[in-house]
Amino acid sequence: MTGSTAVAPADETLYTDARLVALYDLFNAGDHDFAFYASRIGRARRRILDLGCGTGTFARRLAAAGHDVVAIDPAPAMIDHARRQPGADAVRWLACELRGLPPGEPFDAVVMTGHAFQCLLTDDDIDATLHGVRRVLAPGGHFLFETRNPRVEAWRTWTPQQSARRVDSPESGIVELHHAGYEIDGAIVSFDTHYRFHRDGTLLKSASRLRFIAQRDLHARVLDAGFSDVEWCGDWHGAPFDEATSAELIATCRA
């Protein structure tokens, strides 16, 4: 992925298998992040890019609130799923990376949710994305995203015992999930996610790799990309970021 501006590995099973795509929102329920970003964007109509939109839940929410929304994701299966959801007609959907975004009017805000920023594995990936977002933002526009704070070491809970969950899907019935086998290579954490479909006994595995970047390094890269200012929060209530204790590293970057 060196030099690309993809925000999620489009070849991972999680993003390519239609059964797992359909389960994504069930396993990632809750809207604390969406509520936080929506409050930062405000109620006045804005032109918004949802970068790495996944199943499109937040993009549809923004469109329903009256915003002009373009949503992109490098995984066609995610975009196909998003297009079939209620309210999808109000959003412009594109299966592409940021560098493949067609020319158009600048955006007032770019959002990247779901810890998608951590799929940028190299310095080149991060820098290309930050510079690319800066280019498509209008003066005074904002880039809002989050990543996990490496100091808290969230991966230590990605064990079968601590990560086990289950959902009951109308299409698939009961499905269990757990993480296992995490490995650390510098700033990159690799792990597997295992799925068990009770209805037919199907077992699926998706391998993931995430980058954990320190706030100091990320702050410098944001400014180097041409942003004038950045505010850091440490949780979805808006508390200031504390490197020792904050689980989240939430950025509001001003162009």
Regions found by a protein language model. Give the residues of each.
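C-terminal lobe and adjacent flexible extensions of AdoMet/dcAdoMet transferase-like proteins
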Residues: 209-255
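Class I SAM-dependent methyltransferase SAM/SAH-binding core
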Residues: 56-100
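A short glycine-rich, Lys/Arg-flanked "PGG" loop and its adjoining helix->strand segment in the class I
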Residues: 127-139
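Conserved S-adenosyl-L-methionine
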Residues: 52
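A short acidic, Gly/Pro-enriched loop at the edge of an enzyme's catalytic core
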Residues: 101-109
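SAM-dependent methyltransferase
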Residues: 144-219
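Conserved class I S-adenosyl-L-methionine
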Residues: 2-46
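A short SAM/SAH-binding and catalytic strip from SAM-dependent methyltransferases
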Residues: 108-124
